[in-house]
Amino acid sequence: WNVIKVIWGSYWDQLLAKDKSGLLVKRMNECVDGEYQVFKAKGGSYVRDKFFGKYPELRELVSSMTDKDIWKLNRGGHDPHKVYAAYNAAIENTGSPTVILAKTIKGYGMGKTGESVNTTHQQKKLDEEDLLYYRDRFNVPLTDKQVKNVEYFKPSENSEEMKYLKERRLKLGGFIPERSSFAKQIKAPPKDIFDAFMKSTGEKEMSTTMALVRMLTALLRDKNVSPRLVPIIPDEARTFGMEGFFQKIGIYAHEGQKYEPVDSEQLSSYREDKSGQVLEEGINEAGAMSSWIAAATAYTNHDIEMIPIYIFYSMFGFQRIGDLAWAAGDSQARGFLIGATAGRTTLAGEGLQHQDGHSQLLASNIPNCISYDPTFSYEMATIFREGLRRMHEKKENVFYYITAMNENYAHPEKPKKCDEGILKGMYLFRENNNKGKTKVQLLGSGTILREVIAASEILTKEYGIDSDIWSVTSFNELRRNGMETERLNLLNPNEEPKKSYVQKCLEKRDGPIIAASDYTRAFSDQIRPYTDKSFYSFGTDGYGRSDTRKNLR
């Protein structure tokens, strides 16, 4: 970084030149911010006594100055000449970013109402006396009447100021801020890349995290997509099964490999490279998220479409960098956030610090964050493929949050005609009709869907109760659909009411609804208003515990 400090204004220059002993600079460095605020709130006499008066030599240094002269001693950030010099130096610098650190006064120009005064943020306007003071202080050419009417001063069209302003606006691309993108569209990967994940794994078991990593490995073989992938890992790359990326695409290091890694004899040893693609951020989630935002907004900032994929312990995502996630939404980011090792009972033995039971709820608060909690590899593949289509073919300004688990189990073949349901949030996974005495609707998401399937078998064998099993890939998307349906009906009272997707799925089904997830009950409770059936939710309210998966459940 090229750092330019603009600390003291021009009125200090003569005093600093006279200060041969360095005592003035010493005094400047002794004072803390709170003192500097008081100096500007109290006036010249106070500054003479409290700032210069500490040392006899400094009091003598300003003996020929009036209190008004001392009051004029300005801060660098309010000196047009110093600010100009700093800005000029900044634009002439090449090869590194520049930051200008300027010392200023809180509420500068507000007079008694706000200058160096601890007012609340409820102070929204100045009274007439303050406005007139502001006019006089900055020589704004307005009459008293114009000031009292709070009129703006506009320079004439031929003035130097107006010419300069227009020239700068044109160089910046126009008068109104505009989000433009001329990025070349990424060609969608062929569907056959995802075909392997639509098939049954047979007796072979794997986690949804491993399924995702295998998808990314397949995408790295696609010449159109591979250069645009940005895998970001703050920690635990090997836990997620991503060590194969180290040799394949390398870890980015701007100075290259500078050491022999301890695992150098292994096939998947750490390989750092100046042109590496993996961003290994260390245990720094804020830095990793910032890198993700940079890549996720490159389509508009740099006209380059990127596909950032940030994989992290789900507990250390939205909870730890929530404000950055909100900023990502505000910045219209496009990319994938993967909350790995998700689920409060699925990540066994890690205790309350690690066991995530609410990241999906946190994600639901960001309007353009599309979130899913898939159970099977075909669901993960369908969601990921749709994310690529929406963000990079349709160029929608959304980003995806997908939770992935570390529980290994077999994955079935993709049922027919379930794409719409997977993407909307739920689909009928299986019907158990054994002419039982009654029936229930069982809803499950993530790894807990498998517990729901097991519960269905118990209900049939031990209690003679039939059930329909629904895989809920996104309670969040179902809720959004329900709210949008409610809104349409509210705004169109004379039309036939529309039905939410949840209502369409369940209205003709018999029995109460039992919804279960590995998150707090509030997660599945979100869809309660969109059905008139009896609704029971099961979840993981409370803290996590260090125990086995079986005992936790």
Which residue stretches match the model-derived regions?
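Thiamine diphosphate
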Residues: 1-412, ...
